[in-house]
Amino acid sequence: YVDDGSGDATPHCLAEALARYPRLRVLVHPERYGQSAALLTGFRAARGEWVATLDGDGQNDPADIPRLLAARDGAARADLQLISGFRKNRQDSRLKRIAARIANGVRSTLLADATPDTGCGLKLIARAACLELPAFDHMHRFLPALVQRNGGATICVEVNHRPRTRGFSNYGVADRLWIGIVDLAGVLWLKRRALRPEARELQRP
């Protein structure tokens, strides 16, 4: 679990959980660095070959993780590196759903990542692919395109989405728009200039 500088009761709850669950590991940021930084911290600390991610607001359903694993195991692709959740029935406000639909459409068209819902926090990603990702703020919104940029395959799986019962979102529609435009241009630049050279070593006769 990555605590991104929480100012509420999260540290206390995590301390109690540590005492109760021996396998739990908690990584704490001294201040808020953002969702992308939290993901990078988790990726680097992970010990398994695959990493499952989900947001801490309770809207992602952990019970969907086996569904992602099943999709990975059932895919006939050796280059598969990312399984993304797709919140077909989002439990958000109408304004947020409309904004997300437009943003996803523009992003998917420009980046050609074939991902209808890149903002879903529920994902399963190969740790090796995680460690090759470029590190920049808001990169979590473009994981499918970034994985594809490095030569990995991605697929989407429909997942559950639950209503928010507490707290509030740190993402507004207006700030997402302008930041998203800048980030999209940057990712498009990265994707078009990706280098994946291949070579074979000559053997001595």
Language-model regions: role of each:
Residues 124, 132, 156, 194-205:
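Short linear elements at protein peripheries
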Residues 149:
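A ligand-binding cleft/hinge motif common to bilobed small-molecule-binding domains
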Residues 16, 23-45, 50-53, 62-141, ...:
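Acceptor/aglycone-binding surface of glycosyltransferases and processive sugar-polymer synthases
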Residues 152-159, 173:
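Conserved alpha/beta core of the MobA/IspD/sugar-nucleotide pyrophosphorylase nucleotidyltransferase superfamily
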Residues 3-12, 58:
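A conserved acidic beta->alpha catalytic loop
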Residues 1-2, 181:
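Hydrophobic targeting segments
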Residues 20-23, 153:
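Glycine-centered tight turns that cap/initiate beta-strands
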Residues 190:
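Negatively charged linear elements and acidic catalytic determinants
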